[in-house]
Regions:
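Acidic/His- and Gly-rich active-site-bordering loop/insert found
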Residues: 2-111
Length: 111
């Protein structure tokens, strides 16, 4: 089995056996509202995102934001082979206010 085939098999198993849903649910449950300073984005990265990335072989670095102490940047890098093409992706860890009180009784923005 090629490394690519192994990776596809692993990803399929992770998704089909509920690992993806479990991990995503745990990430969604963390309130990282950018307007609410009591939720620390740096802690979210350190406690939730970085462990997942390190498990996949990434080197991670939190970079301070000169405009806002609360909104830091996470830089993660994984070089599998210098001869391979580079893939760049971008995301963010904060969300807008969840407005929990506006959701229907059986729904919440954090589940």
């Amino acid at each position: 089995m090629t490394p690519k085939d192994k990776a596809v098999q692993h990803a399929s198993h992770y998704f089909n056996e509920g690992g993806f849903k479990k991990d995503l649910s745990e990430l969604i449950a963390v309130r990282t509202e950018s307007q609410n300073q009591k939720y620390n984005l740096s802690n979210y990265y350190k406690n939730n995102i970085i462990p997942m990335l390190k498990e996949m072989g990434f080197k991670c670095n939190i970079i301070k934001n000169s405009s806002s102490e609360a909104n830091v940047f996470l830089f993660a890098e994984r070089i599998e082979n210098h001869n391979f093409k580079t893939i760049l992706t971008y995301g963010h860890g904060d969300v807008v206010l969840g407005q929990n009180e506006s959701w229907e009784d059986d729904l919440t923005p954090y589940k």
